[in-house]
């Protein structure tokens, strides 16, 4: 079983380049099947989730061609619409974004069938908002035997109000509506940057979407979509993870290929606790040479503090001077890292959707397990700070969303290696001392 072995206590220093946004890529890759012409997508992150989704896209008959490690060409014209368009295999059930193929295939072919989605166990993420949106457009939805089936004689534009702000439902309904007859309005839409990116991608294919990035999205249906070449935006969560890692290890890191406006909530909190953040046109530098201050954080939909950065920021607050309060308002099961972090010496208690963190001077190396993607990244940051050696197992979760995470950290001076056996761990320990 692959795991990371890490010797902590070294500040991160140097430069790191951020990959394309995983959450944007998953929506864009799914939407690429909505035209019969070839689509070329650049800056695709080479992570497990995107690879699995591309396998599923090939599985329904689309042609997928890798131009290079981060560029892929997709042609949906080879899909046979007379099949049941069933997306079901052992891989697709492991990623939550499999449901984007529901909206994409429904929008193009008026029917699709996809396995119930998986992903990280961070709490209930029901698909009722997706279903409500599809039904408002005229589709019939059936759930049976672990599969979701959607079918419509014709999709008709509609007014859709999202009862709860949902990134996934906003993207899915937006895709389903782009070729519906008439106008669709999505109210209380999510505003995350990757929603804007998916909308921009669809517009580059000939869709007519306005208002993405606001809470009201307006879509005028078009007859068909055409091919395009499109580059995915940088990943704000990967960027934020390296920003926090730089601050936690008291380092000095230039984080390249970012959109600083997408990072404002993270930048604001890092500045509040005493780190220095310098913004450039497409990069940010994070510096810290002292113990940071405590603060309070509440996760909120964009442009608020992102839930996907809560575990990483909690690691930094667990090292701060004072008591911090972290309130999780998006997912109810996002404190699974607390037990693991406590093994490293953190003082954290959880009360409902709130964690109270009494800062400690440093962490002690320990053997810990990644419970999910972002918590896994947080535990790696903790291990980079800790005295002595740590191992982080179950890194399959981390590999879902971070490309070459260990390689990028080594480029910043971290002592980290991906290993599979106890013998390899011992060799690493002997080598680094």
What is each residue range found by the language model?
Residues 1-433:
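Short, structured segments at the rim of ligand-binding sites
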